[in-house]
């Protein structure tokens, strides 16, 4: 099957899986990235090594029409930033890292942890006019534990999503015809800066969720009139009488007292 692909490196394994499933990739779409928190190097390298045309500008209706006229049968989107036009006969599939219809939005992984959910998943759905609202083609749920972080959740998604993408490509005609409408759902805005902040007055439970939700991306500890950016840390739950905000070092690890625990700093940003 001839396809086009849109995305960046977070879900790059989907692109490889589609090729292994027998798809011929006709064109690759990505978007400009900072190559600090977001990358497109793997996607671009995939295209260049195979001589596949690629672009980092927005997909247009004209792009999709040309693909359709050239015999392309589908476009698969996995983490693509821009809105994909829907005025096209080309079947457009989006890979979304949440168990829709709950978790619509640009960055559902940290939201899953911040909300204390015990389940998430990956959903493949038709691209529709509303973000993440299209009929569901395939989805798979997986458990989320109290030890999961943004990094472990992302790795689970990077394992599940390619398998679903390959299965969708193999059975696209059948899945497209039997897709299930989502109905009412829940949209999660991208977390704001204040949601990434831990203060000495926070409960250990809230601090734990923040530290796990932004592990590897970074969060902020705000105390004593200063802000410190932390890349990785963890919260140790413990009863104590130490004043919140007090810092000590244990085994070479800096720790800040919280209400009901300690914030341990493993890596500064």
Predicted segments, located by residue:
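A conserved acidic, glycine/proline-rich C-terminal tail/linker
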Residues: 234-250
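A short acidic-to-branched-hydrophobic micro-motif
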Residues: 224-239, 263-269
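One-carbon transfer enzymes
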Residues: 1-222, 247-269
């Amino acid at each position: 099957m001839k396809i086009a692909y849109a995305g960046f490196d977070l879900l790059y394994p989907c692109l490889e899986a589609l090729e292994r499933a027998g798809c011929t990739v006709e064109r690759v779409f990505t978007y400009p990235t900072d190559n600090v928190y977001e990358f497109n190097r793997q996607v671009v390298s995939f295209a260049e090594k195979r001589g596949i045309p690629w672009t980092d500008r927005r997909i247009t209706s004209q792009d999709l029409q040309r693909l359709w006229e050239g015999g392309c049968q589908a476009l698969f989107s996995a983490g693509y930033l821009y809105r994909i036009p829907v005025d096209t006969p080309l079947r457009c599939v989006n890979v979304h890292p949440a168990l829709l219809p709950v978790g619509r939005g640009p960055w559902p992984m940290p939201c899953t942890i911040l909300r204390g959910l015990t389940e998430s998943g990956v959903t493949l759905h038709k691209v529709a006019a509303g973000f993440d609202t299209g009929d569901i083609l395939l989805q798979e749920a997986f458990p989320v534990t109290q030890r999961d972080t943004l990094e472990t959740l992302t790795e689970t998604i990077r394992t599940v999503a390619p398998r679903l993408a390959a299965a969708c490509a193999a059975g696209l005609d059948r899945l497209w015809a039997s897709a299930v409408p989502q109905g009412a759902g829940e949209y999660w805005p991208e977390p704001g800066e204040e949601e990434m902040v831990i203060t000495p007055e926070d409960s250990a439970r809230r601090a734990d969720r923040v530290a796990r939700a932004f592990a590897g991306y970074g969060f902020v500890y705000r105390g004593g009139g200063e802000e410190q950016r932390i890349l990785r840390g963890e919260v140790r739950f413990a009863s104590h009488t130490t004043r919140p905000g007090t810092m000590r070092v244990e085994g070479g690890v800096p720790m800040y007292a919280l209400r009901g625990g300690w914030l341990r700093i493993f890596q500064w940003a």
